[in-house]
Each structure stands twice: as structure tokens, then as C-alpha cells.
């Protein structure tokens, strides 16, 4: 068995050795939950990696957004190059859920754009969890959403070894059952046959094909082939073909599920008729019968996840299978930025249920569709393994769970102090932050600026661009892989300034950043709370020149608390440096190969300014409005906007 082994030129230093020992000791003594309070730049990721190495236990790290998950994934890959470090996030670039608006009698079909590259990484994650123990999965909160049963997923795998008796026709039938497509094109999740050779492109790889040669009904050879060059890269003795969908089901189980679906359909249609809802009764019968026929013929159907209760053999109301069910029992769960991630986990269930209720009440889905859902918070609590909450500002829940005790990691290995905080008047803040940015850029550093509204961020970005500054605007509409590219461009100097509304939530790790500008810091609210301010201040804590300017006309309670906590930490850090003769130095961190580069970014290399072409500007604005409508459950308006976008982009 491959063991976890960190590859790094650094050794634990500062508060890291004590934090690592404390967490490992707690895990060894059976502590179910612990909290790591680590300031920005103190090496929390290295501490997590060290805990994994010392305990030799599989781990999942849950982050509150895809950008942070991608950064953690890259860091963990660099620490564990010989181990399986996987990435599991939602594979939707765009997602509009199925919905019904009774007021206008409008049904909206599910509309989604799946990112095939992220789907590949999801399959790689589940495969690793089932095949080995040296696995670290970095995930977003999508890991608590329904996923196929790990038992069925594992049961459906097809092992093949040299010399084994195997009928090629039967193998083709098995591959179709695993949702592989038959064809001559080399694409992931497909297979083809030429003479006595069957070529299969596994669901969990993007850069290799397996060619299986037969001599009669016997496997004669197994070769790994580069799909681009056609060259043989490896000769194998055995392989295991994993399903191309997490919802594949053995034929007997599928037929049993169909029988149960038909029973519920009869009951559902009868209830509608008894209530004199003839339209709804006809609708549910027509839609469900169509799905049943598709499942009988192909093993799947559109929206098959809505029948997951039956496919996984669950009872009504049972928790769904999720990625957590693929984890070994002794796994460690790290909740990164727990002050943000825990509330996200808590909120997932209710929104999903409210939307499905309309579909069920009007005959678009049967009640069993309610079991295709994320875990409730209580279910998540029941299923979580050993947990370590990680944050610079742990929330009330985390501290309650750990009895108010937290392992502190305030001393950075580099000796860096928390940044100096300066308060300036909000009047004239745009001009001042422009001048401060230009001075910072002239010294070779980068700048982060956070505003209160998207409109203000857009206007500031446009103004700075007109003034000749290389600037980009980071916002929620930017796709996952493009967001990672923008952050990489900032570090490389392709851009010098990054503007955003809630930059602290993006998990930005920019050692080159020497200035953070917080506009309208005195406007109390979520974006200017104590927690948010401390997190945002921390963005400048990786550079010895780091400064934070808070633009405010009054000092609010949140500002005062955040600055006092920053000063407390600075005092502790300064005393430690004096006692150990440490001279602070900027964190040295190479710009690693981004996730998008490794899986093939779909982003076109175009100017950051999407507003140069009026037509492009219209489409971008419409896309933003469409996504906002979907988030606000205004699906009718979202569909209208989607249709308008299709009209504008038609050739």
C-alpha cells in the first residue's frame, strides 16, 4: 500500500509543529471534532497535509467555493505527488433546475451545461476512493448532494486480466450497460471495435486508451495507448473499467426499480384523479411512462437521478448516497474556511425542497423525487467522520462543537506580521485608491480592491483600465476554470489589480499582493462584518510590505474589533520574532500549473475587457441577469433571457 509522504523543501516552523502535534494527538485519542484557528499565511494547508501524513488516513477537504477548492487541490498535489489527490466539485458551468411556475402555468425543463473536464475529475475521485487508501479529495459542498450508490458503482466495474476467458460481444454489452457509447471517435466514455481489438476510453482518464486484444474468447494483450499519437505507452496485466455514470444500475436492480416506480405511478395518478386533477394525472403518467421505457431500453433516462430512491434501494425519506459514502470509515474531514462552509452546508436542503414541491403538486414529478436531494444538516452531522474545522475566524458552531477550544496557529513560518491597517476618509476614496494602487504597482506588487456592489466594481474596473492600469474584475458569473486563470494572471503580472465585491470569499492566495483597499468599510453588514474584515485584511498578510487601507468616515464596531484582533496578533508575532531573532520575509510560492491547464481550459484567450463589442456586452449582461434570475428562483424570466441569448448568438 502506498503511504502518504510529503514532498516539500520546508519543515514545520512557527506555530506549525505545535498545531500539528495537538491535532494528531486529538485524532489519536479519538477526538471527533477539533478546530484549527490559523491566520492567513501561517501554512494551514501544510499543517493539514502534515496531519494526513502522520495519521496515514484518507482525507476529504471541503471548501466553500470552487476557486478555493482548486487552489487547495494544487497545493495538496504539490505536497503529495506520489499519492492520489483528487478534485470533486459541481460539474455544471451553467445550471437551471427543473421548475414549474403555477401562476403562469409555465414548466421549465432542466437546462444545464456540463463541464466534461470536471466530470472526468469526479470519476477519478470516486475511482481512487474505491481502489486505494492514500487519497485526498478536495471538494466543494456539492459533495453532500445525491450521488449513485458506491456499492452499485463498485459492483458494476468490469475487471479484465491477461488470459481470462471473455466473450467480446458480452464485453460490449457490459460497456453499454456502464453507459459507454459505441463509436469510432476517441472520446472519454466511449469504445470501438476493430477486428479482434476492443478499444475503450475510460471515464476517469483523459489521456489514455486501453486496447484489449482477443484470441478467440481469451484476452491476449492489454495495452495503454496515447489517444493523440496512437503510440503504446504501457503493457498491462490487468485493468478495471469503471462506469461512465455514477447512476449505473445492474439490470436486475433496474427492473426491480422500474416495478417500484410503476407502483408509485399508479398511486400518484389515482390520487390526482380522486382530487379531480385530470390534467395532472395524465401528465405524470405520460412523463413517467416515457422515462420507464427509456430505462428499459437504454438503462438510463433524462433526469434519472429523480428515481434514485428506487435505484439505490432506499426507503422514502432515507438520506441519499453522497460522496461521503465513498469515504473509508477512518477518513479525516477538514472543513476549510469553516465560518463560510458550515453555513453553506446548513442551507442546501431547504431551497431544493421548495422547488421540487411545485413539480410534484402539478404532476411533473412523483413524490419520490424529493429523495434526490442534498443531505440535511442533521444528516451531515450524523455522517461526518473525524472533523477538523479550519479558519482564521471560526464560527460559533465550530467553537460550540469543540467546547470553545481551538488550536491556534498565529505565527507564520516566514515571520510575517499581520498587515498594518490604515483608516482613511471615504470621501474621495476612488481617487485615493487609484493613487495608492499606482504607487504599489510601481514597486512591483499587486493590489486587491473590494467594493460593496457589482456596479461599483464594474465602474472602478473600467475607470482604472481607462487610466492605463492592467485590471480585472472577479465576480460570481466568471466560470470556475476562468476564475483560476485570472488569479494566476494576477500573480504572473498579466494584470496588476483585481477588483471584486467579496474577494475574501474567493480564497485568494497572492503573496505578490502588498495592498488591499476596502472601500466603504464603515457600511455595516455581511460584507463589512468583523469576520469579513479580518478575512479581507488577511489577503495582505503574505507580503512583508502588506498594507490595508479601510476607507471610512466613521469607525464602526466591526472595524474596531477587526483592527484590535489584528493588533493583538501583530503583538504576539512581533514578540515571537524578537525572541527568535527572525526577520520577516515575503512568502515565496511558485505559480503552479493550474487545474485548467492540466485538464484543458475551455476558456478562449481573449481580452479581459468583454465590453469592447456592444453585441458581446449585451450577451454578457443578459447572461448575468439570467443567472441572477435562476438564483432567485425566477425561472420564467430566466427562460425568456436564455431564449434571447440563443437568438443573439445564432449564426
Curated annotation (Swiss-Prot):
Keywords: ATP-binding, Cytoplasm, DNA damage, DNA excision, DNA repair, Excision nuclease, Helicase, Hydrolase, Nucleotide-binding, SOS response. Its main location: cytoplasm. GO terms for cellular component: cytoplasm; excinuclease repair complex. It comes from the Bacteria. GO terms for molecular function: ATP binding; ATP hydrolysis activity; DNA binding; excinuclease ABC activity; helicase activity. Residues 616-651 form the UVR domain. A motif (Beta-hairpin) lies at residues 91-114. Residues 427-591 form the Helicase C-terminal domain. Residues 25-178 form the Helicase ATP-binding domain. Residues 593-615 are annotated as: Disordered. It is found in: Cytoplasm. Pfam families: Helicase_C (PF00271), ResIII (PF04851), UVR (PF02151), UvrB (PF12344), UvrB_inter (PF17757). GO terms for biological process: nucleotide-excision repair; SOS response. ATP binds at residues 38-45. The UvrABC repair system catalyzes the recognition and processing of DNA lesions. A damage recognition complex composed of 2 UvrA and 2 UvrB subunits scans DNA for abnormalities. Upon binding of the UvrA(2)B(2) complex to a putative damaged site, the DNA wraps around one UvrB monomer. DNA wrap is dependent on ATP binding by UvrB and probably causes local melting of the DNA helix, facilitating insertion of UvrB beta-hairpin between the DNA strands. Then UvrB probes one DNA strand for the presence of a lesion. Forms a heterotetramer with UvrA during the search for lesions. Interacts with UvrC in an incision complex. Belongs to the UvrB family. HAMAP family: UvrB. This is UvrABC system protein B. It comes from Anaplasma marginale (strain Florida).
Amino acid at each position: 500500500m502506498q503511504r502518504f509522504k510529503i514532498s516539500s523543501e520546508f519543515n514545520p516552523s512557527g506555530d506549525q509543529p505545535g498545531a500539528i502535534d495537538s491535532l494528531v494527538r486529538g485524532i489519536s485519542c479519538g477526538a471527533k471534532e477539533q478546530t484549527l484557528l490559523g491566520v492567513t499565511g501561517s501554512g494551514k494547508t501544510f499543517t493539514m497535509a502534515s496531519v494526513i501524513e502522520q495519521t496515514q488516513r484518507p482525507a476529504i477537504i471541503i471548501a466553500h467555493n470552487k476557486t478555493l477548492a482548486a487552489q487547495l487541490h494544487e497545493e495538496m498535489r504539490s505536497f503529495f505527488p506520489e499519492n492520489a489527490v483528487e478534485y470533486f466539485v459541481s460539474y455544471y458551468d451553467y445550471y437551471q433546475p427543473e421548475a414549474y411556475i403555477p401562476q403562469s402555468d409555465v414548466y421549465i425543463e432542466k437546462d444545464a451545461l456540463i463541464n466534461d473536464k470536471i466530470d472526468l475529475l469526479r470519476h477519478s475521485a470516486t475511482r481512487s476512493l474505491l481502489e486505494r487508501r492514500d487519497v485526498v479529495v478536495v471538494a466543494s459542498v456539492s459533495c453532500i448532494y445525491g450521488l449513485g450508490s458506491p456499492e452499485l458503482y463498485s459492483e458494476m466495474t468490469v475487471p479484465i486480466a491477461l488470459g481470462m476467458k471473455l466473450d467480446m460481444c458480452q464485453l460490449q454489452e457490459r460497456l453499454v450497460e456502464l453507459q459507454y457509447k459505441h463509436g469510432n471517435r476517441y472520446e472519454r466514455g466511449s469504445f470501438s471495435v476493430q477486428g479482434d481489438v476492443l478499444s475503450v476510453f475510460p471515464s476517469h482518464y483523459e489521456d489514455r486508451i486501453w486496447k484489449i486484444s482477443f484470441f478467440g474468447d481469451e484476452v491476449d494483450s492489454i495495452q495503454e495507448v496515447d489517444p493523440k499519437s496512437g503510440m503504446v505507452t504501457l503493457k498491462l496485466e490487468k485493468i478495471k473499467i469503471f462506469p461512465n455514470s455514477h447512476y449505473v444500475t445492474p439490470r436486475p436492480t433496474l427492473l426491480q426499480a422500474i416495478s417500484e416506480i410503476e407502483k408509485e405511478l399508479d398511486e400518484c395518478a389515482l390520487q390526482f384523479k380522486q382530487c379531480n386533477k385530470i390534467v395532472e394525472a395524465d401528465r405524470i403518467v405520460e412523463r413517467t411512462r416515457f422515462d420507464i421505457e427509456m430505462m428499459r431500453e437504454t438503462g438510463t433516462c433524462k433526469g434519472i437521478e429523480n428515481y434514485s430512491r428506487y435505484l439505490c434501494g432506499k426507503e422514502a425519506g432515507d438520506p441519499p448516497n453522497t460522496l461521503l459514502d465513498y469515504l473509508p470509515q477512518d477518513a479525516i474531514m477538514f472543513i476549510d474556511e469553516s465560518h463560510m462552509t458550515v453555513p453553506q452546508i446548513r442551507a442546501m436542503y431547504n431551497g431544493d425542497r421548495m422547488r421540487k414541491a411545485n413539480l410534484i403538486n402539478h404532476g411533473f414529478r412523483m413524490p419520490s423525487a424529493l429523495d434526490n436531494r442534498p443531505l440535511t444538516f442533521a444528516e451531515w452531522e450524523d455522517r461526518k467522520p473525524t472533523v477538523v474545522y479550519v479558519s482564521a475566524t471560526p464560527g460559533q458552531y465550530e467553537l460550540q462543537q469543540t467546547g470553545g477550544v481551538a488550536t491556534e496557529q498565529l505565527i507564520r513560518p516566514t515571520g510575517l506580521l499581520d498587515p498594518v491597517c490604515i483608516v482613511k476618509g471615504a470621501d474621495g476614496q476612488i481617487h485615493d485608491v487609484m493613487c495608492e494602487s499606482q504607487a504599489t504597482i510601481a514597486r512591483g506588487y499587486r493590489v486587491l480592491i473590494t467594493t460593496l456592489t457589482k456596479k461599483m466594481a464594474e465602474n472602478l474596473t473600467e475607470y482604472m483600465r481607462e487610466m492605463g492600469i492592467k485590471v480585472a474584475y472577479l465576480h460570481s458569473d466568471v466560470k470556475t476554470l476562468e476564475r483560476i486563470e485570472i488569479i494566476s494572471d494576477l500573480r504572473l503580472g498579466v494584470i496588476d489589480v483585481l477588483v471584486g465585491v467579496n474577494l475574501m470569499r474567493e480564497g485568494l492566495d497572492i503573496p505578490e499582493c502588498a495592498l488591499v483597499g476596502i472601500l466603504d468599510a464603515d457600511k455595516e453588514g455581511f460584507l463589512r462584518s468583523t469576520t469579513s474584515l479580518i478575512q479581507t485584511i488577511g489577503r495582505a498578510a503574505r507580503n512583508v510590505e502588506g498594507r490595508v487601507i479601510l476607507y471610512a468616515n466613521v469607525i464602526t464596531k466591526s472595524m474596531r474589533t477587526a483592527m484590535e484582533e489584528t493588533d493583538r496578533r501583530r503583538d504576539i508575532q512581533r514578540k515571537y520574532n524578537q525572541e527568535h531573532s527572525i526577520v520577516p520575509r515575503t512568502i515565496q510560492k511558485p505559480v503552479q500549473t493550474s487545474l485548467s491547464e492540466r485538464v484543458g481550459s475551455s476558456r478562449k484567450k481573449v481580452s479581459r475587457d468583454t465590453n469592447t463589442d456592444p453585441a458581446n456586452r449585451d450577451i454578457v449582461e443578459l447572461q448575468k441577469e439570467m443567472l441572477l434570475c435562476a438564483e432567485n428562483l425566477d425561472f420564467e424570466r430566466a427562460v425568456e433571457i436564455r431564449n434571447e441569448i440563443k437568438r443573439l448568438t445564432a449564426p
